[in-house]
């Protein structure tokens, strides 16, 4: 996460011109900065979200929710994992679901994002009870039980970090 954070901090100001451009720049930076499979997963997710927002100058909360859903789906498509496999998707899928549900209930974007963060944190903690079926932890089998999945926990951290910026 430290390398990812530094890669984001090192982006030039020009990377933040549009929502779609920002997401694409973040994806490229994270692809280079994060080792293992997480780098390509994050890069693909951010690029997919970027494409969803490409023609929208000022995305609405629903536009962001659709972009988030596209990003989450792209990780599952690329890696073949699903919620319940004890991966980052066990935080991402509940977060996307909660964000959608909260917006459908006419909650404001900040409140909807708070629900997403809570769902991600709960999902990440639930991975401690799961036997890994995908990802690097799958090699550990039942020995992984008792410790939350690192990828899911990382997701919950960065979703929480974004919370103060959602209005």
PLM regions with names:
Residues 1-167:
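N-terminal loops that bind phosphate or other acidic moieties
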């Amino acid at each position: 996460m430290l390398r990812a954070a530094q890669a984001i901090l090192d982006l030039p100001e020009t990377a933040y011109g549009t929502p779609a451009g920002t997401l694409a720049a973040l994806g490229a930076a994270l692809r280079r900065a994060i080792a293992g499979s997480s780098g390509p997963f994050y890069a693909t997710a951010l690029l997919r979200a970027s494409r969803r927002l490409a023609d929208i100058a000022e995305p609405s909360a629903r536009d962001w929710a659709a972009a988030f859903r596209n990003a989450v789906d792209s990780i599952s498509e690329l890696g073949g994992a699903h919620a319940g496999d004890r991966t980052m998707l066990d935080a991402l899928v509940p977060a996307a679901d909660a964000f959608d549900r909260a917006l459908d209930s006419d909650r404001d974007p900040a409140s909807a994002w708070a629900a997403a963060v809570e769902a991600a944190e709960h999902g990440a903690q639930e991975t401690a009870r799961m036997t890994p079926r995908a990802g690097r932890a799958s090699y550990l089998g039942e020995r992984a039980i008792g410790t939350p999945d690192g990828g899911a926990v990382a997701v919950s951290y960065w979703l929480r970090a974004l919370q103060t910026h959602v209005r």
